Amino acid sequence: MISQNNSIGTIKEIDGLRGVAMFIIVMSHFDAHFLQSGGVNIFFVVSGFFITKIISNKGIDFSIGNFYISRANSLYPQLLFTTILVFILYLIFGELEKINYFFNSFLAAISSTMNLYLIKQGNVYSNQEYINLFLPLWAFSVIFQFYIFYPIALKIIFSFNRFFKLSPVRIFYILIISTVISYIAYMYYFEKGNDVSNFYSPFSRLWQFLLGG
């Protein structure tokens, strides 16, 4: 689903988790009740682990700008190729009377805001009158948004660490507390019945990334 930086090496257990996640995702497309979203959740946790590992290895010397460039170079060529190919195929074989719906979803896909677009639509599965060919990219959008803001948060922690000399254990506690707070917030919105926002919002998925971190 998402390629990771190979500079931290290959971890067999993580590769195994990816395999399990892919299996769950494939099976859920045949049976919607089969561990619903479980595979995507695993990918979020794995992404949180890898990004935390990449950043923590460099510590205070970590460059946010270089990280953004490396992530864009790694992810966007695949995204652009896929979305442009689908765009061309739709112009040839698609329902042109619904081109407005398609174009809006295309813009959301290439801008990595598909999840926000779906929240605006107000339905977990988007517009029921139009099959959104880019719907699976909502998870990519959540991951990309996490890549934007999470490095900034870690950079701030590392900067504070220069003055307060936080031990690795205390930094670990900070991540644990942040994960718990994020999960409590997620459960609060879940109980309030905000199904669409709860499903697609990067904030409701934050605890999964932090759990991996």
Question: What does each model-found stretch correspond to?
Answer:
Residues 1-213:
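Membrane-interface helix/loop caps of multi-pass membrane proteins
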